[in-house]
Amino acid sequence: MQNPPSLGLIDQFHRKINYLRLSITDRCDFRCVYCMNEDMQFLPRDEVLSLEESLRLVKIFTSLGVTKLRVTGGEPLVRKNIAWLFEGLGQIEGLKEIVLTTNGSQLAHHAHMLKMSRVKRINISLDSLDPMLFKKITRTGDLDKVMLGIDEAIKEGFSNLKLNTVLMKDVNDHEAMDLVNFAINKKMDISFIEEMPLGAINHKRKDTFISNDEVLKKLQAHFNLIPTTFTSGGPAKYWQIANQSTKIGFISCLLYTSPSPRD
């Protein structure tokens, strides 16, 4: 007698789970002011899943119906032997979409490997186009390396590239229009993310918080934005820029129960 077919993974809201988010490290080569203190203490390495364990888990989840994987961190690309993991992920049958979230600092070095490993989409954090301000926000980041990473990803043929930007009042909110124009020129999408009340930081979030509604109003004064029903499977609400391929997404820090999985 055969066992009945598995229904896969179902959550408490009766949604079928086909999306897995895998954080492979809490370590990062940036110390972004909205994310962590400069003297952040990371987990002991022996408390983090090995790459072999991570790959095995993804295979198990794929056998249970997961078809989309997002690899994140920390900064995933600083993990030692990361190429081995992506090469293994790219060989898993049934895994239809692999997505990477990165700060872009190591992207130039890994872009070809990621393309060969069937990574479909890359989200790149970019909070400023000004090298000095970028350094101030990230504390340790080099804007030139991120720009090189973006260009290398484009050269490798990645067409699903998206920028993620955290705007802060009186810090980088004046760059919203320039960042959108940059995305248009690179034929990328861009999402603006409200500063999240997460982690220990060195400033008061109430002083730097700017709502998506404020950002949207500013952008509508310069761009013809058309509401869309487009979704990448996450919480962003998207607007299409008229006569352009670029879409602008807005991600709120207020969480809600959605019929779709989180991005």
Task: Show where each model-derived region lies.
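Conserved alpha-helical substructure of the radical SAM core
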Residues: Q2-I98
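A short acidic, helix-capping loop that chelates divalent metal ions and anchors anionic groups
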Residues: M40-P44, D130-I137, G199-H203
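Immediate flanking context of iron-sulfur cluster ligation sites
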Residues: I251-L255
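Flexible glycine/acidic-rich beta-alpha junction loops that bind and position SAM and/or redox cofactors
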Residues: K169-V171, S191-N212, T228-A242
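Conserved small/polar residues in nucleotide/adenosyl-binding loops
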Residues: Y256-D263
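Gly/Ser/Thr-rich active-site loops/lids in small-molecule metabolic enzymes
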Residues: S211-L219
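Radical SAM/AdoMet-radical enzyme domain recognition
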Residues: L51-R70, V78-I193
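Short secondary-structure junctions
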Residues: L219-F230
